[in-house]
């Protein structure tokens, strides 16, 4: 068991040494240039904004009042049904827990 412990300790120290070395190399890079993470975040944010704007434009171009009314009606009916079933389920669970 002592050799396993030493092997595990050696591996942990090796990983920590690699992390410290990588952190030092990152600090030695030019501090004036933005980090890779910042570039990735900006790129993803740009793509997201573009996709959101395109989706909003498409929605506004294809907006139909009758479809919107049907969707609202379907949502209200389904949420009412889910509320009913959730209350029935809650009542059944409480009955099982109380033992009535």
Curated annotation (Swiss-Prot):
The lineage of its organism: Eukaryota, Metazoa, Chordata, Craniata, Vertebrata. One of its GO terms (molecular function) is phospholipase activator activity. Belongs to the apolipoprotein C2 family. Component of chylomicrons, very low-density lipoproteins (VLDL), low-density lipoproteins (LDL), and high-density lipoproteins (HDL) in plasma. Plays an important role in lipoprotein metabolism as an activator of lipoprotein lipase. One of its GO terms (biological process) is lipid catabolic process. PANTHER family: APOLIPOPROTEIN C-II. Residues 1-22 form the signal peptide. Proapolipoprotein C-II is synthesized as a sialic acid containing glycoprotein which is subsequently desialylated prior to its proteolytic processing. This is Apolipoprotein C-II. Keywords: Chylomicron, HDL, LDL, Lipid degradation, Lipid metabolism, Lipid transport, Secreted, Signal, Transport, VLDL. Residues 78-100 are annotated as: Lipoprotein lipase cofactor. Coiled coil: none annotated. The keyword Signal applies. InterPro entries: Apo-CII, ApoC-II_dom_sf.
């Amino acid at each position: 068991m002592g050799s396993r412990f030493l092997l595990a300790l050696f591996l942990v120290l090796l990983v920590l040494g690699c992390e410290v070395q990588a952190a030092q190399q990152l600090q030695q890079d030019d501090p004036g240039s933005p980090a890779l993470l910042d570039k990735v975040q900006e790129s993803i944010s740009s793509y997201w904004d573009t996709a959101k704007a395109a989706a909003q434009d498409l929605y506004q171009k294809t907006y139909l009042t009758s479809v919107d009314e049907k969707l609202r009606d379907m949502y209200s009916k389904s949420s009412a049904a889910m509320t009913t079933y959730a209350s029935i389920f809650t009542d059944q669970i409480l009955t099982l827990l109380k033992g009535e």
